[in-house]
Design a protein with these regions (language model features):
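Amphipathic alpha-helical coiled-coil segments
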Residues: 40-55, 141, 147-164, 182, ...
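Outer-membrane beta-barrel domain signature
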Residues: 70, 74-77, 81-83, 196, ...
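Periplasmic alpha-helical coiled-coil/stalk elements that build and connect Gram-negative outer-membrane
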Residues: 50, 142-254, 366, 370
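Sec-dependent N-terminal signal peptides
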Residues: 4-14
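Bacterial Sec-pathway N-terminal export signals of envelope proteins
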Residues: 19-68, 74-75, 230, 235-271, ...
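Small/polar-residue-enriched beta-strand and adjacent coil segments characteristic
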Residues: 62-73, 81-140, 262-271, 278-351
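Acidic, low-complexity, intrinsically disordered peripheral segments
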Residues: 64, 73, 418-446
């Protein structure tokens, strides 16, 4: 089973090795174009624009068709004095009753249009702020995706470098095993020395399998971020032999998260303004045009001469004025809640600013430290190579022991690994500095 897994991993690496080699810049561009998380952020922008249109539509007139049919199961009665009914009634009645017809039909067109409503205008301003926030959220999502792609890309480069260095170490150890086996056959070394060399070779092969698996996993993660099919072949560039420094400016004060913090405070202020606008009276235009029909039998609406005689026009236009008087302190409490939110937003903005400054300082320290480590380990690696060559030659001549040559080989591998790790951490620190200086997208402009 283990042999099958190792074979599958090597076949995967073999396919990847013949796949498309993509630079970091190409990966970032493709990720921005394809990533589904960014697509959702673009949809959020469209939703916020729709919110502005929705609030503006509240300023337009609303026209509704109205139709109502009423069947009075018990017909209503109106009571009045007879003198109000004209000469057809007795001159001195006490009361007269008028019974309504059983069926009533009301049909017409109703109009409502706001003329003065500060709540609507305040809501439009708030919707515009939400749209600006959605744009900033998209910028932040692009930044986050770029950081994710950069970290995975650099990690894949590190694993690829470790895999290739392990190949070199295996070749070196195979040569040492061949030398030791020849010396064993000649009786120069003991069998335990040969076994030590073989054990180290097996350990290196196991290490190679591990790096191959990590590299394959990191490429899969990169495919996910770029929205590529799992079967699509992909490979990253090999890590440069030397570190490449980029000029870094200071902290940018226009970072998306800083502008988002400011806009969130502004949105809270807009909400407070909208609530305060509810204290202001509103004026709206209202109108109606239609007709009322009455019949004592329902079929008279359609089949008798009376169907056209018992219809009465109804048309009016007017103004509605709404004056807020008492709301049990509801709006006051809402404003108080939003003021607390505003205080929290100010505190979050200050904390964010402090965190950015701390992250920038730490990234600078990390950058300088890893430059020093890389340079030191590069020298150590070169020295370890020279020492190993001398020890290997001495071992062939029977002057040096197997323990000494294995120790030198171990020091060489340690320097290799530390050098690669320092290069990887340098790339991460530089990536973070590019983000904090607002130059992250310069990676796509190379």
């Amino acid at each position: 089973m283990k042999t099958k897994i190792i074979l599958i991993l090597f076949l995967s690496i073999g396919l990847i090795g013949h796949g498309q080699v993509m630079t970091l810049e190409e990966c970032i561009r493709q990720g921005i174009a394809n990533n589904l998380t960014l697509e959702n952020s673009r949809i959020d922008i469209n939703k916020s624009r729709t919110g502005i249109s929705q609030n503006r539509a509240r300023l337009l007139p609303v026209i509704n068709g109205v139709f109502q049919f009423t069947d009075y199961l018990k017909r209503p009665v109106n009571v009045t004095t007879g003198t109000l009914l004209g000469n057809d009634f007795p001159e001195d009645p006490t009361w007269q009753t008028i019974r309504s017809m059983q069926y009533n039909v009301n049909a017409g067109v109703q109009l409502n249009m706001p003329l003065y409503n500060q709540v609507i205008y305040a809501s439009i301003d708030a919707a515009k702020t939400v749209e600006q926030l959605s744009h900033l959220s998209y910028e932040k999502a692009v930044e986050d995706l770029t950081m994710q792609i950069g970290k995975v890309y650099y990690l894949a480069q590190s694993s690829l470098e470790q895999t290739m260095l392990t190949d070199e170490n295996i070749s070196r150890m195979q040569e040492l095993c061949a030398i030791t086996e020849a010396m064993y056959e000649q009786g120069v070394v003991l069998e335990v020395d040969l076994n030590r060399a073989r054990i180290n070779l097996q350990n290196l092969k196991a290490q190679q399998d591990q790096f191959a698996m990590l590299y394959a996993q990191q490429l899969n993660m990169l495919r996910f971020l770029l929205d590529l099919a799992p079967e699509e072949q992909l490979e990253v560039e090999r890590m440069p032999r030397d570190i490449v420094q980029i000029n870094i400016s200071g902290i940018s004060h226009t970072l998306p998260e800083l502008r988002m913090a400011t806009k969130q405070k502004e949105l809270i202020d807009r909400k407070i303004t909208a609530i305060k606008a509810e204290y202001i009276p509103t004026i709206s235009l209202t109108g109606y045009a239609g007709a009322l029909g009455y019949q004592d039998k329902i079929n008279h609406f359609f089949h008798t001469k009376a169907s056209s005689q018992n219809w009465f026009g109804n048309c009016f236009i007017g103004l509605n004025i709404t004056i807020p008087i008492f709301d049990a302190g509801s709006k006051k409490l809402q404003i108080r809640q939003h003021k607390y939110d505003a205080e929290q937003a100010i505190n979050r903005a200050e904390l964010l600013q402090d965190k950015i400054m701390t992250d920038y300082s730490n990234a600078l320290l990390q950058l300088d430290h890893n430059i020093e480590v890389f340079q030191t380990q590069t020298q150590s690696y070169q020295q370890a190579c020279d020492v190993f060559k001398v020890t290997q030659e001495q071992y062939r001549e029977g002057v040096s022991s197997m323990t000494a040559i294995l120790q030198d080989e171990m020091q060489l591998r340690t320097a290799q690994s530390a050098r690669t790790q320092a290069h990887y951490l340098f790339n991460l620190a530089q990536l973070e500095l590019l983000r904090l200086s607002g130059n992250l997208l310069s990676l796509t402009e190379k």
